């Protein structure tokens, strides 16, 4: 009976990833990565392990709906980076979607705003057409540096989604931009 009412967002995303050729599997519950990006008002639905990727795990978070608000989901992509401790803690950027008419209009453009500590991420991500297209279609994206038990970066998508091959390749591309950002900063100093 409990299985019938359980939220299957994690199972569905795992199935979608395998369908497009990404080798993914469900991790055991109470995985250490379930706490990454998890706030008091959210609960983790579990982690998906991804093989042969710069994003080795995905955590799915949910905020249950209330009387006046629907449930919400966040998809957290983990990007490990041992060099992250060298980068300033303020690194946190997110997409700003500009609409033709406030609230209801079509999305005309996507830019990145926030603090990238001179890494050049905002400029790199803002001019990439594939990343703009992904953000227009799937929602807001946010990149944060993590310095706790998990050392690296998180890419957070603020809703459920069913990835296509192009979506996954673009997410991998974002991860590669993030992982190469320190080299850009080092070149700039010279």
Which sequence ranges carry the predicted segments?
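Charged, low-complexity intrinsically disordered regions
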Residues: 30-34, 40-42, 66-72, 80-190
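Charge-rich, low-complexity N-terminal segments
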Residues: 1-91
């Amino acid at each position: 009976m409990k299985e019938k009412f359980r939220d299957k967002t994690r199972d569905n995303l795992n199935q979608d990833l395998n369908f497009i050729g990404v080798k993914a599997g469900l991790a055991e519950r109470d995985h250490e990565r379930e706490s990454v990006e998890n706030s008091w008002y959210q609960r983790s639905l579990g982690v998906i392990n991804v093989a042969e990727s710069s994003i080795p795990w995905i955590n799915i978070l949910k905020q249950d709906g209330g009387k006046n608000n629907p449930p919400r989901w966040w998809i957290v992509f983990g990007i490990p980076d041992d060099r992250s401790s060298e980068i300033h803690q303020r690194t946190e950027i997110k997409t700003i979607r500009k609409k033709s008419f406030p609230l209801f209009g079509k999305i005309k453009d996507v830019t990145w705003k926030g603090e990238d500590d001179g890494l050049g991420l905002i400029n790199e991500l803002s001019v990439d057409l594939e990343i703009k297209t992904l953000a227009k279609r799937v929602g807001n994206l946010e990149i944060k540096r993590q310095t706790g038990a998990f050392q690296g970066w998180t890419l957070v998508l603020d809703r459920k989604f069913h990835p296509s091959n192009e979506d996954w390749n673009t997410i991998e591309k974002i991860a590669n931009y993030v992982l190469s950002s320190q080299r850009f900063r080092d070149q700039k100093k010279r």
